[in-house]
């Protein structure tokens, strides 16, 4: 039991170094596409030049679990928690059960957003995997988005600086990156949400 609790707290390591928090200098720069017909996954992103903690977040446009376009900038005025997870990660699966309860508890001024970066094989998640994630975690109003590794970059210069899964990025009501953390810690997650609300 202790092993599983430690695994949930620390998260799944990738080939990247695991960071306790996302520090100053965390930046995002995602290639922009404008006229290409999007497929499931990343539709496009904009305003992504050197977005550091305290700066405006990049406007990600992804597909949600209903295969509808989901745009981050549509949620200005809400506290947003981005959860970067993978299907293959045990701690991500365990933490996934908190998404809908947190969404329900904090209500309309808060949005818990799961971005599935990889499926079970390390490739982008399939529709079946996303549907299963939604079903297993009893998600009804908390968005689950199709993502992939193009959102990530250990240096933080060309994507989110992710060192392990799950990684959480907190965005304030003005769409500024506030802080990030690796691994689910319920009291910490709640304290940051409450601070930003």
Question: Where are the model-predicted features located?
Answer:
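Sec-dependent signal peptide recognition
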Residues: 1-7
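C-terminal motif of bacterial Sec signal peptides marking the signal peptidase cleavage site
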Residues: 10-11
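N-terminal "domain-start" segment that seeds a small globular fold
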Residues: 16-19, 30-73, 141-144
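Short pre-active-site segment immediately N-terminal to redox-active cysteine/selenocysteine motifs
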Residues: 78-80, 84-88, 119, 164
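Conserved helix-turn-beta segment immediately C-terminal to the redox Cys motif
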Residues: 78-79, 94-117
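Conserved redox-active cysteine motifs that mediate thiol-disulfide chemistry
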Residues: 84-101, 122
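Short, internal strand/loop/helix patches
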Residues: 113, 129-167, 171-173
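Thiol-/selenol-based redox modules, centered on thioredoxin-like
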Residues: 163-197
